[in-house]
From Swiss-Prot:
Gene Ontology MF terms: 3'-5' exonuclease activity; magnesium ion binding; nucleic acid binding; RNA exonuclease activity, producing 5'-phosphomonoesters
PANTHER family noted in UniProt: DNA POLYMERASE III SUBUNIT EPSILON, RIBONUCLEASE T
Protein name in UniProt: Ribonuclease T
UniProt-annotated binding residues for Mg(2+) 1: 23
Family (UniProt): Belongs to the RNase T family.
Site keyed Important for substrate binding and specificity: positions: 29, 77, 124, 146
Active-site residues, Swiss-Prot/TrEMBL: 181
Cofactor(s), names only, from the UniProt record: Mg(2+)
Top-level lineage group: Bacteria
SMART domains in the record: EXOIII
Subunit structure: Homodimer.
Residues reported to bind Mg(2+) 2: 23, 25, 181, 186
Length: 215
């Protein structure tokens, strides 16, 4: 069990929150009506010196839920064919159940109280995860119901860029545009970006908070 008073521990860095990077690919913008087609998650860890690093990765292609809307423009944009049997897609329930199980394990190991979604334009990904969890009747959702860490906002502050590819390149993180709009690739790059932003703030002296400012 991690010590919450240890500022080099994950639980001490984010006030007991356990950050998990998420990216989804969908068949539209409406989380209630449009299909979730792909999801990836990257958990994070702190090393002994307090530097944030990617940890475990989970990735699933997802079958559209019954009656889901499939917007042709969205499918053309992300290049996903929901009917392709080679996708190896699973149900929303199975995908989220596996992710939630891994997240709850990480919560316990890191001594955190609750998971929080990290994503680029996080409201979008958060809304699809929450809607899918409700459809799948998954009661033990480890994620905060509304709070998120948004790397688009953080990148705008730190790097002057809000587009994922431009933010990564500005931060010195390679970004292959030909792999963009794959949930797996975007999640991995977003995880690297979030770690870079958090670690850069530490290097600049912003963390731990100077004595007197945290009181």
């Amino acid at each position: 069990m991690a010590d919450k008073s240890d500022l080099n521990a994950l639980s001490g860095r984010f006030r007991g929150y356990y950050p998990v990077v998420i990216d989804v690919e969908t068949a539209g913008f409406n989380a209630q009506t449009d299909a979730l087609l792909e999801i990836a998650a990257v958990t994070l860890q702190m090393n002994k010196d307090g530097w944030l690093l990617p940890d475990e990765t989970l990735h699933f292609h997802v079958d559209p839920f019954e009656g889901a809307n499939l917007e042709p423009e969205a499918l053309a944009f992300n290049g996903i064919d929901p009917t392709n049997p080679l996708r190896g897609a699973v149900s929303e329930h199975d995908a989220l159940h596996a992710i939630f199980k891994a997240v709850r394990k990480g919560l316990k190991e890191q001594g955190c109280n609750r998971a929080i979604i990290v994503a680029h334009n996080a409201h979008f990904d958060h809304s699809f995860v929450m809607a899918a969890a409700e459809r799948a009747s998954l009661k033990r959702n480890p994620f905060h119901p509304f709070a998120t860490f948004d790397t688009a906002a953080l990148s705008g502050l730190v790097l002057g860029q809000t587009v994922l590819a431009k933010a990564c390149l500005t931060a010195g993180i390679p970004f292959d545009s030909s792999q963009a709009h794959s949930a797996l690739y975007d999640t991995m790059q977003t995880a690297k970006l979030f770690c870079e932003l958090v670690n850069r703030w530490k290097k600049l002296g912003g963390w731990p908070v100077p004595a007197g400012e945290s009181e």
